């Protein structure tokens, strides 16, 4: 599943399907 852009404006790799949130990882 793809992830939306995080608050920092970067694509995140880890996502939570329950709340559909994304965390930015470098």
UniProtKB/Swiss-Prot annotation:
In what tissue types does this protein appear? Expressed by the venom gland.
This entry carries the following GO cellular component terms, namely: extracellular region
User: Chief subcellular site?
Assistant: secreted
Q: List the disulfide bonds.
A: 3-22
Q: Name one GO molecular function term.
A: ion channel regulator activity
Q: Which UniProt keywords apply?
A: Acetylcholine receptor inhibiting toxin, Disulfide bond, Ion channel impairing toxin, Neurotoxin, Postsynaptic neurotoxin, Secreted, Toxin
Cell compartment(s), UniProt = Secreted
Keyword Metal-binding listed: no
Give the top-rank taxon of the lineage listed in the UniProt record for this protein. Answer: Eukaryota
Could you say which protein family the record assigns here? Belongs to the three-finger toxin family. Short-chain subfamily.
Its biological purpose is as follows: Binds and may inhibit nicotinic acetylcholine receptors (nAChR).
The name this protein goes by in its record: Nicotinic acetylcholine receptor-binding protein Mnn-1A
Q: Which organism is it from?
A: Micrurus nigrocinctus
Its lineage opens with: Eukaryota, Metazoa, Chordata, Craniata, Vertebrata
